[in-house]
Amino acid sequence: MTQLQQAFGSYMHIVHLSSADALRSYRRGHGIAIETCPHYLTFAAEDIPYGATEFKCAPPIRERENRERLWAALEEGAIQMVVSDHSPCPSAMKSGDFSSAWGGIASLQLGLAIMWKHVHDRGIAPKRLIEWMSANPAGLAGLPYRKGAIAPGFDADLVIWNPNAAPPAELHHRHKLTPYQPHQYPGAVEATFLRGQKIYERGSFASAPLGAILKP
């Protein structure tokens, strides 16, 4: 893929990077953006219990040493984004063994708490979360002039985050099976604003969708 990208001078976005080995070829390219996911930065293959299919995802979770290399690449900028890859499913689809179980992890509601705990434990400046989870994704989407920053002329898309709040009592997404243990990730979103309009506050959601087409 890297050779094709370089040959044609095209732009390439690598999604859900789980293997740090792949970075050796991507580092040589220009016009390449890379994302990874909270589960690749949290779990390690050595720690997954036998038959625990709630950890199955694609690409798979890899070894502890690989996880640390992903963190190093994220901090130095070789990986620019952290995205949820939220992929929930009914519990029945996770039954059976790893060969037949659904491959996906539900994490959308917990993503900020997970990453907040990681940067705190690793001594990373919290402002890096803004880069990885807001500013850089906005730039990739071609919206750096409108999204991803608190500045004049930008949409007032805001999250009111309380790092000292108790973990959520329940998950809001429909299919709640997840390998994460919510009680291990304190903090909660108190409110969310979209273009200045409050769409969420302490478990209550806006009654009508307020999304808009950003680019034709």
Language-model region placement:
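Histidine/acidic residue-rich metal-binding segments in metalloenzymes
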Residues: M1-V82
